[in-house]
């Protein structure tokens, strides 16, 4: 929200955020409880940003809507990668749809976004993503 309303932006090489991996971090655990917490956290952020979209001035709304769309794409991606389940993906899509977050907006944010949006808009596309994305992640 700060960057959306900023009148001047200064660039710097300083790191504003840096993540240190450690054993106690929720992002390093793959148990069901940790995954559920991560997904709940993402949904909470999406809900809060969606709430803000309706309350910020129109000039700020476009940037915030883009962020919501990109986070929604990332959420769907994480469900595909971590859950690897058609049932979980369908539940995710249905939940996002009920909140007005799906289908993803028809915007040209990036090539990755455009293709992901097109693929997630069809059952066949979602099945292809579900069967290929987890394999691509392993190769990297």
Give the label of every model feature segment.
Residues 1:
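Acidic donor-binding loop at a coil-to-helix junction in glycosyltransferase catalytic cores
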Residues 4:
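Short, well-ordered alpha-helices that flank and scaffold nucleotide-derived cofactor binding pockets
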Residues 8-44:
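Nucleotide-sugar-dependent glycosyltransferase catalytic core
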Residues 30, 52-56, 78-83:
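Secondary-structure edge/capping motif, primarily at the C-terminal ends of alpha-helices
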Residues 41-63, 101-106:
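C-terminal, non-catalytic tails of nucleotide-sugar-dependent glycosyltransferases
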Residues 62-67, 90:
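Short, charged, amphipathic alpha-helical segments
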Residues 66-78:
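Amphipathic alpha-helical repeat scaffolds of TPR domains
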Residues 81-140:
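Membrane-interface aromatic/basic loop that binds lipid-linked glycans or pyrophosphate carriers
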């Amino acid at each position: 929200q700060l960057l959306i309303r900023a009148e001047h932006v200064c660039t710097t090489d300083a790191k504003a955020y840096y993540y240190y991996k450690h054993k106690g971090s929720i992002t390093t655990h793959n148990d069901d409880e940790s995954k559920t917490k991560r997904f709940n956290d993402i949904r909470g952020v999406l809900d809060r940003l969606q709430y803000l979209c309706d309350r910020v001035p129109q000039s700020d709304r476009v940037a915030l809507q883009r962020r919501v769309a990109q986070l929604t794409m990332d959420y769907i991606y994480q469900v595909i990668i971590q859950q690897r389940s058609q049932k979980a993906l369908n539940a995710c899509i249905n939940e996002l749809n009920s909140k007005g977050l799906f289908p993803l907006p028809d915007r040209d944010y990036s090539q990755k976004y455009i293709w992901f949006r097109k693929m997630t808009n069809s059952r066949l596309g979602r099945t292809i993503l579900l069967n290929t994305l987890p394999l691509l992640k392993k190769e990297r």
